[in-house]
Design a protein with these regions (language model features):
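AlphaC helix of the eukaryotic protein kinase fold
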Residues: 65-82
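Activation-segment/catalytic-loop signature of the eukaryotic protein kinase fold
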Residues: 94
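Conserved short submotifs of the Hanks-type protein kinase catalytic core
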Residues: 98-112, 116
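Activation segment signature within eukaryotic-like protein kinase domains
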Residues: 135-136
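Catalytic-loop of the protein kinase fold
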Residues: 147-163
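Conserved activation segment of eukaryotic-like protein kinases, specifically the C-terminal portion
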Residues: 180-192
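Conserved C-terminal C-lobe helix
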Residues: 239-254
Length: 320
């Protein structure tokens, strides 16, 4: 039997839900993480909220429970607050509410590249070589800025890249080091990071190379990586010029002598490539498009003589 000093189930804090106010300021509007998300205990759940002290401005809140490294997250968040780049959301405060830590950042309207990839798959489309080259040229300056501050994203993948609605620019979301340790999406991190190694700038470039290969092919990383040799398979149907493919292969190199030494070096190499005329999506070359043939024209038959119309005014419709 419970004694008066024992906490009863009724006294346990209720789980957050839509409408709850966090830090007497941010009202939760929608949970954007699936309830069955296996990464939730470590990476937390993502919420959309409105700032009641800023006219209802939208914000993104990440909820980290007791299972997460909250102290490490606080330290990492304070570092990210120093990042001032137009393609990185502004990082706000860190709020403790009950057993949870809430990390606040600026909201960005747009669609993730994972969402774009899935939408195109329904239409049998993938990213074209010109479109990818443009994306890399737009995104690498962000990595140059981060790495110059000795910061690493740590979880670069299509789901953590957003195409912003207002200007079409790519925006980096959900840094993989929010919990103090590295939490990277499977398939995008090099083996050294997946095995617990320290995050390094070249690992962001590796993840960017995997992301590029996924966008070009429409296939997940597991379908593109040989599990024995750990070599990446390049489908022959990829829409990529040889010069672009060469630079993408350098992004994916694990040999320090063969890969890019920095994001700035990768950016210079990609800026030197000619931009294709087309910067839009292309059909998946490995899929057969089934085209519906037009209905055959009817065979000509005998022509009936015209008969005069009797009893119909000009404004009346002809009988069906």
């Amino acid at each position: 039997m419970a004694t008066p000093s024992d906490p009863s189930p009724a006294e346990a804090p209720a789980p957050p839900e839509v409408g709850h106010l966090i830090g007497e300021r941010y009202q939760l509007e929608q949970c954007l993480s699936a309830p069955s998300d296996d990464a939730a205990p470590v990476q937390g759940r993502l919420w959309r909220a409105s700032d009641q002290l800023a006219g209802g401005a939208l914000m993104a809140l990440r909820q980290l429970g007791p299972a997460a490294d909250q102290e490490g997250a606080r330290r990492r968040w304070s570092q990210l607050q120093t990042v001032l780049h137009p393609q990185v959301p502004r990082f706000g405060g860190a709020i403790t509410a009950g057993d949870d830590l809430w990390l606040v950042r600026e909201w960005q309207d747009g669609r993730t590249y994972q969402e774009l990839l899935e939408a195109r798959a329904e239409r049998q489309l993938v990213f074209g070589g010109g479109e990818l080259l443009l994306l890399l040229r737009q995104l690498l300056p962000v990595l140059v800025a981060l790495h110059s501050q000795e910061l690493v994203h740590g979880d670069l993948c299509p789901a953590n890249l957003l195409r912003r609605d207002r200007d079409g620019q790519p925006v980096l979301l959900d840094f993989g080091l929010v919990g103090g340790g590295v939490v990277a999406t499977a398939g995008y991190a090099p083996p050294e990071l997946a095995q617990g190694g320290a995050a390094q700038p070249w690992m962001d470039l590796h993840a960017l190379g995997v992301t590029a290969l996924v966008l070009l092919s429409g296939e997940p990383p597991a379908s593109l990586l040989d599990p024995v040799s750990l070599e990446w398979r390049w489908p022959a149907t990829l829409d990529a010029e040889p010069e672009l493919r060469l630079q993408l292969e350098r992004l994916l190199q694990r040999d320090p002598a063969s890969r890019f030494a920095s994001a700035a070096q990768a950016l210079a190499a990609l800026q030197a490539l000619p931009m294709p005329d087309s910067t839009g999506p292309v059909p998946r070359a490995d899929r057969t498009l089934v085209l519906v043939a037009p209905a055959p024209s009817p065979l000509p038959g005998p022509v009936a003589p015209e008969l005069p119309l009797v009893g119909l005014a000009e404004s009346q419709p002809l009988p069906a």
